[in-house]
């Protein structure tokens, strides 16, 4: 349509010029009348300008294709189109700000994504929600001998984040936040369960950064650089994370690993997609999430730094199946051995060496088994560290103060997937804690039975689980909804719905 309008415009200019010529000739003027040749020259100049405008307005091949499609859709048999439809199609074609074919979006492999056609830029947003109802029964909790029962709903996790790659598939990134579920006022109790005071705590519902890292693969090599806030390369259960395991991590993972073992640092990774992969580097310490650069004791930071490393050996199976603590969806039998180490140090000689040895089996038949030994050696014990999303704090005065201590623990889990939906599971744990308040029963045993139902894989999963601690536990483990119940039995019942988009 732009070409047609240019012709009309040119003809109009010529008509005006020719019509004005007699009038100009008749009017008295001191200027000499233009000759016929001069008029022809003016017409030629106007034609040149019109030709230039036509060239600038010429639609691109993509626009011509779009106009052609619009015409065919209007009358596919005759190829004719009404003037208004032609005007609309031409306007739509010329109003394109950019070629939409350069970006694609959709849903694949149970993930939403936005990416460039060449795959160099990818954004995958995600949301992870766990809605939980928990009942805790602490036997003979009160001095009168009565039980204490607590029940209620909680949004155990409400996490959002995104991951993908930038500039090249070799440069990947990951960032996510979780909402804090704590109250603004935290009640403090002693080993006997009596309230001794209150302290402030981050307000529930506020976002807390969990991970924010970048990873670069040196092209066509097995070497990677990994920097930012990430999982400490120590404990496999915590590296897997909350999306692909039981409703909550084991007590050893929560207490010894500080709930998902988030830290800040830089590591080097060797991964040639073969049977062995290694990650190791420097960190700010095992409990250094969301802290600044300052050392202890400035800013309440408990650790000055550390080094960490993990080695994994795959005997058989696919590595992707090792990223979950279940055999759900396994196409091949999986067997992997792993071991991790973390040495974290702080001012005043408070140093800590944590280590894990684990093995995971996941059969294509649905059978799953996992065993992990987690030990912790502490020099000049300051008290057992409390779990939390920001740095670390320590329990009240302990008989182990300034002593060198060692704490062993073992976690064993089995599960079996039935008909690709049902999955009964069981877990046994034993921990020996040090650095707890005076009078504590430090031998902790955890027996758990549960059942998963996969509506749509991990994306929509329902879980019911019952936990029994026959001798209780001398500290709170808020992450798993286990409350302090020193020397007395405790039952914990929970149901949970997981939504992962």
Task: Tell where the protein language model's regions lie, with residue ranges.
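Bacterial N-terminal signal peptides that target proteins for export
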Residues: 1-12
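Bacterial N-terminal signal peptides
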Residues: 10-20
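N-terminal periplasmic/intermembrane-space "pro-region" immediately following the signal or transit peptide
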Residues: 22-130, 138-142, 275, 501
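Outer membrane beta-barrel
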Residues: 100, 107-288, 301-319, 323-331, ...
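Outer-membrane beta-barrel pore domains
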Residues: 146, 191-202, 329-501
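Active-site rim elements
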Residues: 200-201, 255, 293-298, 341-344
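Interfacial loop-to-helix transition and helix-capping segments at the boundaries
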Residues: 298-302, 350-352
């Amino acid at each position: 349509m732009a070409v047609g309008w240019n012709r009309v415009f040119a003809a109009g200019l010529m008509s005006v010029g020719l019509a004005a010529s007699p009038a100009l000739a008749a009017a008295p003027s001191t200027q000499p009348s233009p000759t016929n040749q001069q008029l022809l020259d003016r017409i030629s100049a106007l034609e040149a300008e019109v030709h230039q405008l036509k060239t600038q307005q010429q639609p691109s091949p993509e626009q011509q294709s779009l106009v052609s499609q619009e015409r065919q859709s209007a009358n596919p048999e005759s190829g004719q189109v009404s003037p208004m439809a032609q005007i609309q199609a031409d306007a739509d074609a010329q109003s394109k700000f950019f070629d939409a074919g350069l970006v694609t979006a959709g849903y694949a492999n149970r993930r939403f994504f936005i990416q460039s056609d060449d795959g160099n830029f990818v954004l995958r947003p995600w949301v992870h929600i766990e809605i939980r109802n928990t009942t805790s029964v602490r036997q003979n909790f009160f001095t009168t001998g009565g039980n204490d029962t607590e029940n209620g709903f909680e949004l155990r996790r409400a996490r959002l984040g995104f991951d993908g790659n930038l500039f090249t598939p070799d440069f990947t990134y990951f960032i996510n936040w979780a909402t804090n579920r704590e109250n603004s006022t935290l009640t403090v109790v002693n080993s006997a369960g009596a309230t001794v005071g209150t302290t402030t705590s981050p307000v529930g519902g506020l976002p807390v950064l969990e991970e924010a890292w970048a990873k670069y693969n040196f092209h066509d090599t097995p070497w990677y650089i990994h920097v930012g806030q990430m999982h400490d390369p120590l404990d496999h259960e915590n590296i897997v994370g909350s999306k692909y395991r039981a409703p909550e991590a084991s007590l050893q993972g929560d207490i010894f690993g500080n709930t998902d073992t988030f830290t800040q640092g830089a590591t080097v990774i060797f991964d040639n997609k073969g049977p062995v992969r290694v990650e190791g580097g420097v960190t700010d310490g095992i409990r250094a999430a969301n802290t600044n650069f300052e050392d202890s004791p400035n800013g309440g930071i408990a650790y000055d730094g550390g080094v960490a490393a993990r080695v994994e050996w795959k005997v058989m199976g696919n590595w992707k199946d090792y990223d979950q603590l279940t055999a759900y969806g396994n196409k091949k039998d999986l067997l992997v051995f792993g071991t991790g180490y973390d040495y974290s140090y702080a001012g005043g000689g408070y140093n800590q060496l944590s280590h894990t040895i684990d093995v995971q089996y996941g059969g294509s038949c649905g059978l799953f088994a996992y065993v992990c030994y987690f030990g912790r050696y502490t020099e000049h014990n300051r008290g057992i560290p409390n779990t939390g999303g920001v740095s670390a704090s320590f329990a009240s005065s302990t008989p182990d103060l300034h002593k060198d201590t060692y704490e062993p623990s073992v976690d064993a889990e089995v599960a079996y997937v039935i008909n690709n939906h049902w999955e009964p599971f069981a877990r046994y744990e034993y921990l020996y804690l040090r650095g707890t308040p005076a009078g504590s029963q430090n031998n902790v045993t955890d027996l758990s039975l549960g059942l998963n139902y996969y509506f749509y894989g991990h994306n929509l999963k329902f879980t019911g689980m019952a936990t029994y601690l026959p001798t209780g536990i001398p500290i709170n483990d808020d992450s798993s909804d286990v409350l302090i119940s020193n020397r007395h039995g405790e039952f914990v019942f929970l149901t949970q719905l997981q939504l992962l988009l």
